[in-house]
Design a protein with these regions (language model features):
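N-terminal basic/disordered segments at the start of proteins
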Residues: 1-26
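Beta-strand initiation motifs
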Residues: 23-28, 146-148
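Acidic, divalent-metal-coordinating active-site segment for phosphoryl/phosphodiester hydrolysis
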Residues: 135-141
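Short, glycine/acidic-enriched loop or turn micro-motifs at the edges of active sites
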Residues: 10, 134, 205-208
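A structural signal for short, well-ordered beta-strand segments
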Residues: 29-35, 202
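Helical "lid/coupling" subdomains associated with nucleotide-phosphate turnover
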Residues: 17, 40-67, 78-90, 96-126, ...
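Short glycine-aspartate micro-motif
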Residues: 3-7, 127-131, 200
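Conserved beta-strand/loop subsegment of P-loop NTPase cores
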Residues: 72-75
């Protein structure tokens, strides 16, 4: 079976094409569009510019799927559409222009599917899972391989930076402002922060950027998939520096995320401190794998079992 999954996110819109054969899932193609929908919010609604960006990406992906004769695909949206006050208008507009009606994933469901996806790549026992998107951050605490608590915070790398940063590069004062905003949101969860979770699992663009930047700056081996809390802290210190010699190398490694990098790293660093994490494992699997496993494979397998009975 070959199946396409389109993730309509707040910062990026992605297409993943999966092949399922002999009990194994293989990612055969991955496409990304930097849409920055979280920057297209005005008075709580998605603007015409944002709608046009979303429709452009969706029609592009429809063409890619059609060229490969892939008829089966699903489209879901996360904070990009769930947090706007003109959702129905936007959904109707997207349907009109693309023929697609995206499924809206709400926060807890997004966090759960993140966990399903990462569990396919790691033997999860105890730790914290974090998914920093453009418009939200999902957190999952798990013990003995099972979810203990999960939540979605409506603050992501892009909308946090939009709130606090006036220019392109964040100042030390703006970094402090972002820290205050994200810590207030974490406090509102009213979770028990007494227990330390040594291991964190990171998915999403900020986590991948953290690994990429750490490899370049700290001579971490190319095959390594983990970084430390010290790596993240040092990157934040570089980003908050007034010296261009300190912050420019960071942005140079990942220039496409210049408008969300500081926001994402502030969120990552503050969550690491809250839960006492020492090591961050970066997962290649995430929400799209979780969606494919939970929504598509499970349904297909259930239908097959029913047909046998």
């Amino acid at each position: 079976m070959i199946y396409g999954v389109i993730d309509l996110g707040s910062n990026t819109i992605r297409l993943s094409i999966f092949k399922y054969e002999d009990g194994k899932i293989k990612l055969v193609q991955n496409k990304k569009t930097m849409a920055g929908l979280a920057s297209c919010i005005k008075d709580g609604g998605l603007t015409e510019v944002g709608v046009s960006r979303a429709c452009f990406a969706l029609n592009r992906y429809k063409t890619i799927l059609a060229e490969q004769n892939i008829e089966n695909y699903s489209v879901f949206a996360t904070a990009s559409l769930r947090n706007i006050n003109n959702r129905e208008i936007v959904l109707n507009e997207i349907k009109e222009r693309t023929g697609i009606v995206p499924e809206i994933l709400f926060g807890d469901e997004e966090a759960r599917l993140d966990f399903v996806g990462v569990k396919r790549a790691f033997d999860l026992t105890r730790g914290v899972l974090i998914d920093i998107g453009g418009g939200s951050t999902e957190l999952v605490l798990f013990e003995n391989g099972e979810i203990k608590r999960l939540a979605s915070i409506p603050i992501g790398a892009l909308n946090l930076q939009n709130k606090a940063v006036k220019g392109i590069v964040a100042t030390d004062r703006e970094i402090k402002k972002m820290k205050k905003i994200i810590n207030k949101a974490i406090d509102e969860l009213q979770w028990d922060f007494e227990s330390n979770y040594e291991t964190m699992y990171g998915i999403g663009g900020t986590s991948r950027a953290a690994l990429e930047i750490s490899k370049e700056l700290f001579n971490i081996p190319a095959e390594e998939k983990s970084i430390t809390k010290i790596n993240v802290k040092e990157i934040v210190n570089k980003l908050r520096s007034a010296d261009p010699e300190e912050y420019k190398p960071v942005y140079k490694i990942n220039p496409e995320r210049i408008f969300s990098l500081a926001g994402g790293f502030v969120i990552l660093n503050e969550v690491i401190k809250r839960f006492g994490c020492e090591v961050i494992n970066i997962s290649k699997n995430g929400i799209r794998e979780g969606y494919f496993i939970d929504r598509i494979l499970s349904q297909t397998n259930n239908e097959a079992e029913n047909n046998e009975n």
